[in-house]
Amino acid sequence: MTVFPALPGPLEIEAMKQYEASLRQARCKVALLATPEIKLPGTGAWDYLLISASHARSLPPYALLGMASRTVVVAKDVHSHNDRDWVLNNACTLSTSEFLQSRQNTGKKADMSRIKLLEMLALVADDADTGKLEAIFRQEPKLSYSLLRLVNSAAIAPRNPITSFAQAINLLGRRQLQRWLQLLVYADPNNSQRPNPLLQKAAARGRQLELLAPHLSPHPQVECLEDAAFMVGTFSLLDALLNMSTKEILQQLPLAPVVNDALAEHAGGLGKLLRAIEAAEAGELKQAASTMKALGITSDIYCDAQLASYSWAAKIRPTA
C-alpha cells in the first residue's frame, strides 16, 4: 500500500499524479492521508483512507459509514482508549495503537498476578534459589500456565515441549528465564486466549534496545549491557500495563541503577536511547534522528534493529 498526502507541495503535484496513475494501472493498493483542510474524497476513490481520530470525530454523522462502504477506513493518532472505542464503532476497520501507552483512569487496582511477577523478577535479579521462585508460582498457578505457554511459543520453539517450571529453568537458564518473566508480565493470566498487544510492543522495544545498545557512543560501562537494555525496553511500558506511575513501580523493583535511572529520568545512554525510540514511535522523527545521531547510531543500524526486533516479537504467540 502506498499512501499519498491530501496536500502535496506545488512542485510535487504532477509527479504524484503520474506515480498514482502508474500504481493504479498496476493494480496496487493506494491510500489517501486525509486532512481537515481538504474535503474527503468520494467513497471508492481510494482503497484506503487514513484519518486522524480527532478529524474523524469532527465529521458529520454517518460520513465515515458512507466512506467505509467501498473504502477501508484506518484511524491514526488514536491516543486514548475512548478514541479507540469510538473509531471502531464508527466504521474504522483498523487503528494505530498510541492508546496502548496511555494509562486508564478506571479506578481498578493493579493486577495482583502481575505484582507477584514483579516480586519474582526481583528474586531472579538477586539470584534467588529455585525453591523461592517456585513458591510464587504455587501461589499463582495461572502464572505457571502462562509462562509455559509463552516459553513454548514460536520465538523459542523448543524441540520438546517445556512442561514444568524447573524444566524451564534448566533449559533456558537464569538469563533467558528473566527475559521471559519480563514479557510474561504483559500476558493476560485471566484470559490466556486473548493476545495483549502490549506484549508484542514491549518485546519489540526490548529487543530493539538490546540490538542498538552495543552501538552506543560513548560505549556505556555497564555490566551485561544487552540484558540491561532489554529490561529498559520491556519495562518502559509497565506504567500503561499496571495503571501505576513509573515512580510507584520502581519503588517495588530493586533494579540496577543504570536501568532505574533510564526508566525514571531517561538518564544515561540507555535512557537517551529509550527517549529516541519513544520519539520515533510518536512520529517525532526529527527529534529521534537528532538523538540517534548524538548517540552514534546511524539510520541503517537503527532500521536493521527495528526490522529484526519486529520480526522477533511477531513470533511471540503463546501456544494453546
Please describe what each predicted stretch is:
Residues 22-23, 41-43, 87:
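Generic structural signal for hydrophobic
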Residues 8-11, 56, 79:
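Glycine-/small-residue-rich active-site loops that bind phosphorylated ligands and cofactors
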Residues 1-5, 28-33, 47-51, 71-76, ...:
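Hydrophobic faces of well-ordered beta-strands that scaffold small-molecule active sites
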Residues 58-320:
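Conserved alpha-helical "signature site"
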Residues 5-10, 36, 41, 60-61, ...:
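Proline-rich intrinsically disordered, low-complexity coils
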Residues 17, 37-61, 69, 104-107:
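Bacterial c-di-GMP phosphodiesterase catalytic domain signature
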Residues 1-38, 201:
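Bacterial c-di-GMP phosphodiesterase EAL domain
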